[in-house]
A protein has these predicted regions:
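Charge-dense, helix-prone N-terminal extensions
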Residues: 1-122
Length: 122
């Protein structure tokens, strides 16, 4: 996947917005104002195609053991975030999409019932 495919997949999810809250190169995807994915555009330009995604702690451990391209989240809470190297030889596009959906769903499930209702009504 290239950055445009990642971006298109993320923004196609219900209630997702994209931002640059930290600087002009850190692209952040939020659902209902909560981050579920972020990446450095500089890294993509330099061939380091990485994205940070939220992940269930138990699943994080399993994924890190199984895939060379999945590591503890860089500059993130290592228990709840993974850095996924999208162009790693052991990471398929389908797996990237699956992990984006997992991250999105984790964040949505953590929203208050009121905000979940607002999201459903979009």
């Amino acid at each position: 996947m290239d950055i445009e495919q990642v971006r298109d997949f993320c923004v196609a999810k219900k209630g997702v917005t994209e931002h640059f809250p930290f600087d002009e190169v850190t692209l952040v995807f939020k659902v209902m104002h909560k981050i579920f994915a972020l990446t450095s555009l500089n890294n993509w330009e330099n061939g380091e195609q990485k994205i940070n995604l939220k992940c269930d702690p138990d699943k994080s451990e399993e994924l890190r053991a199984e895939y060379v391209g999945i590591n503890p989240g860089w500059h993130m809470n290592k228990k709840h975030w993974n850095t996924v190297t999208v162009n790693s030889s052991d990471i398929s596009d389908d797996l990237v999409r699956e992990l984006i959906v997992h991250s999105y769903n984790l964040v949505v499930n953590g929203l208050t019932k009121k905000i979940q209702k607002e999201l459903r009504e979009l």
